[in-house]
């Protein structure tokens, strides 16, 4: 079974990816891990990626696509299947993935899209507060400190609601065309993400049981 997992920041994608991998025994391929492994193992594409990163430049698509192809060519993929997390990020990468899978004689079975109302995500992501004295992290709504006094806590700039909203807007603009691309292929399974973590996973597990 070969899957993609998608979702906005704060939707719980990482949590659900870990649960899927544990239950279904898939190879978890996250872009960060994939880049680090390729560079550590000094693969052809990993060495090329490192040359861009060392110069502080963005890694071009063809190198990213090459790293994905290297990883999907490894022997564990045909045995286990995969869960790809964090790729593709653009329509061009989605087209490249189609070509990679075709060349490797693999096919995509489904795209798990964890769907959470952006307004809920703003509340989730912008509620983080940090104690000035202890550095401990709390959440205004979900994990408030017992002795909350506004003067004793601060918020990081990137946790402020307006910053979070801007970040989500960028992610929505980037992610929407990719989800629609796969929806048109009949591959997308929308999962209601604004519920208990275990309920979200139960829904995903039912979908995947029908796919496997």
From Swiss-Prot:
ATP binds at residues 10-15, 128, 137-138, 195. InterPro entries: Adenyl_kin_sub (IPR006259), Adenylat/UMP-CMP_kin (IPR000850), Adenylat_kinase_CS (IPR033690), P-loop_NTPase (IPR027417). It catalyses: AMP + ATP = 2 ADP. Pathway: Purine metabolism; AMP biosynthesis via salvage pathway; AMP from ADP: step 1/1. It is an enzyme of class 2 (transferase). Its EC number is 2.7.4.3. GO terms for biological process: AMP salvage. GO terms for cellular component: cytoplasm. SUPFAM superfamilies: P-loop containing nucleoside triphosphate hydrolases (SSF52540). Coiled coil: none annotated. Disulfide bonds: none annotated. It holds the Pfam family ADK. AMP binds at residues 31, 36, 57-59, 86-89, 93, 156, 167. Residues 127-159 are annotated as: LID. Residues 30-59 are annotated as: NMP. It is found in: Cytoplasm. It comes from the Bacteria. Belongs to the adenylate kinase family. Consists of three domains, a large central CORE domain and two small peripheral domains, NMPbind and LID, which undergo movements during catalysis. The LID domain closes over the site of phosphoryl transfer upon ATP binding. Assembling and dissambling the active center during each catalytic cycle provides an effective means to prevent ATP hydrolysis. Monomer. Catalyzes the reversible transfer of the terminal phosphate group between ATP and AMP. Plays an important role in cellular energy homeostasis and in adenine nucleotide metabolism. This is Adenylate kinase. It comes from Streptococcus mutans serotype c (strain ATCC 700610 / UA159).
């Amino acid at each position: 079974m070969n899957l993609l997992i998608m979702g906005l920041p704060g939707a719980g994608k990482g949590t659900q990816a870990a649960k899927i991998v544990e239950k279904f025994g898939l190879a978890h391929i996250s872009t960060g891990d994939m880049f680090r492994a390729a560079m550590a193992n000094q693969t052809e594409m990993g060495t090329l990626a490192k040359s861009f990163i060392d110069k502080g430049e963005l890694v071009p698509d063809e190198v990213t696509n090459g790293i994905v192809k290297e990883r999907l060519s490894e022997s564990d993929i045909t045995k286990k299947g995969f869960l790809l997390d964090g790729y593709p990020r653009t329509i061009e990468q989605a087209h490249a993935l189609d070509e990679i899978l075709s060349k490797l004689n693999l096919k995509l079975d489904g795209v798990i899209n964890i769907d959470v109302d952006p307004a809920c995500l703003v509340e989730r992501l912008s509620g983080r507060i940090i104690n000035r004295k202890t550095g401990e992290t709390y959440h205004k709504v979900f994990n408030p400190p017992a002795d909350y006094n506004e003067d004793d806590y601060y918020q990081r700039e990137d946790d402020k609601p307006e910053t979070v909203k801007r970040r989500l807007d960028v992610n929505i603009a980037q992610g929407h065309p990719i989800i629609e691309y796969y929806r048109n292929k009949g591959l997308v399974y929308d999962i209601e993400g604004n519920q208990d973590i275990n309920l979200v996973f139960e829904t995903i597990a039912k979908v995947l049981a029908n796919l496997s």
